[in-house]
Amino acid sequence: MRKFIFCLLLLPVTIGAFYLAGSAAYAQDAGGAAGLYKQGREEFLKFTPAGFDKAIELYNQAIKADPNYAQAYAGLAEVYSFMGFYRYQVREEYENYYNQSYTNMAKALQINPNLEEVQLALAYTYLQLSREKEAKTTAQKILAKNPNNTEAIYILWSASGENPDSPEIRKVLELNPKFVPAYVGLANALFFKKRAYGQATQYFKKAAEIAPSAQIHNLFGTALRTQGHYNEAIGEYEKAIKENSNYAPAYMNLGITYYYLNKFNQNIDNQKKAISLNPNYPDAYFFIAQGYEKANNPQQAVVYYKKFLEVSLEQEMYAGYAAQAKERISALGGGK
């Protein structure tokens, strides 16, 4: 579940009753604010980097057409919250995206807090900020008026603990078989909560077919690698790199896969590439050290074990690696 809390904690908002925006809201021609918003949301719902960028462009055009069009500000808040959370996950600069989300969410709420589109954006934003209680409350208010709002059902499921056996997530996929977050969320829940790696792989595969992106190919590859399907995993990591040649996690995971295949030089090369793109991944330093040790270069192994310990900062999730690194430093004579 999400662990990051940001400035939206301070957002003063009273959530009251709201009305549902009907299709009449989009009756304007495609060049009007409503039409541009509709096009922007279609791009957003592709859940791809290119779709997000296009959505921002269209939402800004909608605001230019009508500076008081609340839905467009809500759309910007949505997409910026997704982009901020993504960058937080991959350990890249994210604060500007959350600040943009906050600014646009506040504007949408100021103009018309009761629109379904505004409430949905608010629910998404709460979810991305680990405000699960508020996300659930907001989603439930939407569902009280519109029981088949796919996105609200998904938010409610996610904010309620992401139970992979819940009928809610199945209902989302029945209502909208192309809703990418549901496939990714369910795959992650199956992977981490049930260790049902085969099932998780199928949902990651479906997500990659609908919305190919570096992030999804990387997740798909890791699910394959966990089951020992190393060559297939390599293929997915290479697809991730093709989608985004600057996506550090794909190089890191590609390197780890080569390590498991005893291709230590290829492991080291890919880990160094990952670090050159983003130095904030402790795993990369650890597997470089492992690779050097396997390649009979103890001096470099010690250097990278020590770098791993510096970067990991004794985070609990790296406790096992840290214990191993300290033991190997001592065994290799690097503790002197």
What residue ranges belong to the model's regions?
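Alpha-helical segment of the N-proximal tetratricopeptide repeat
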Residues: A34-Q61, A65, P181, G185-F192
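Structural signature of tandem alpha-helical TPR/SEL1-like repeats
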Residues: A50-E57, F85-K107, Q128-K141, S160-K171, ...
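Helix-start (N-cap) detector for alpha-helical repeat units in TPR-like alpha-solenoids
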Residues: A33, A70-Q71, E116-E117, T150-E151, ...
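Terminal, low-structured helical/coil segments at or just beyond the last alpha-helical repeat
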Residues: K294, Q299-K336
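Residue-level recognition of tetratricopeptide repeat
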Residues: R41, E78, Y124, S158, ...
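TPR-adjacent "capping" and linker segments in tetratricopeptide-repeat scaffold/adaptor proteins
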Residues: A25-Y37, E92
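Structural marker of alpha-solenoid helical repeat scaffolds
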Residues: A65, I111, K145, L175, ...
